[in-house]
A protein has these predicted regions:
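Conserved residues at beta->alpha junctions
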Residues: 9, 90, 162-165
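Short "lid" loop at the C-terminus of a central beta-strand within the Rossmann-like core
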Residues: 119, 141, 164-168
Length: 183
């Protein structure tokens, strides 16, 4: 069980496959600096799933994961919430090739991959104010991140910025940008 969500055997198996594929692909492509299985589980999988602390049910909602890299946090959330409508965005093609491979390998449905820069996505009418949730981790500072994510969420939508120890300082520095953008 994780944060009140049951982790059934089939879901755990998907995480095992994801971990194995990530380790294998990382030998050929620089997908992540984290290579140790224990660190992959804590720093990638569990950190990704910590988004569930902000929203207890992602099922049926649309989520855009900006700067997804090797699929974090979007794919772990999709594994736990199979009815999540997932869009993964990154500007690095090889990372998206890996994400598509994982989506296919895990037989995940209702997933979309977009090769684009976040700055351009928010200006595109096909993506502006289209998502229930916009999420990013380790992409940029909170002020700039607000400018990238907030244009993507619908009115009353949710922006999740996974930040580390400097979160409080970044939030204070980003208050003006968040207010201007309607967050």
């Amino acid at each position: 069980q994780f944060i009140g969500f049951p982790l059934f055997e089939d879901r755990l198996r998907l995480f095992e496959i994801y971990e194995s594929e990530l380790i294998e692909w990382n030998t050929r492509f620089n997908l992540t600096a984290i290579k140790n299985p224990d660190e992959i589980r804590t720093k990638h999988f569990l950190d990704s799933l910590s988004c569930a602390l902000a929203i207890n049910d992602f099922n049926g909602r649309s989520l855009v994961d900006v700067g997804t890299g090797a699929g974090f946090p979007g794919i772990p959330l999709k594994i736990i919430f199979p009815d999540l409508k997932l869009t993964l965005v990154d500007s690095v093609g090889k990372k998206l090739v890996f994400c598509q491979h994982i989506i296919d390998r895990l037989s995940l449905t209702d997933c979309r991959i977009i090769h684009a820069r976040a700055e351009d996505l928010g200006k595109d009418p096909l993506h502006r104010e289209r998502y229930d949730i916009a999420v990013a981790r380790a992409v940029t500072g909170l002020s700039a991140l607000s400018e990238l994510l907030l244009p993507l969420v619908k009115r009353k939508g949710i922006m999740i910025a996974q930040k580390g120890e400097t979160a409080a300082e970044e939030l204070k520095a980003a208050e003006k940008a968040i207010r201007i953008l309607g967050g």
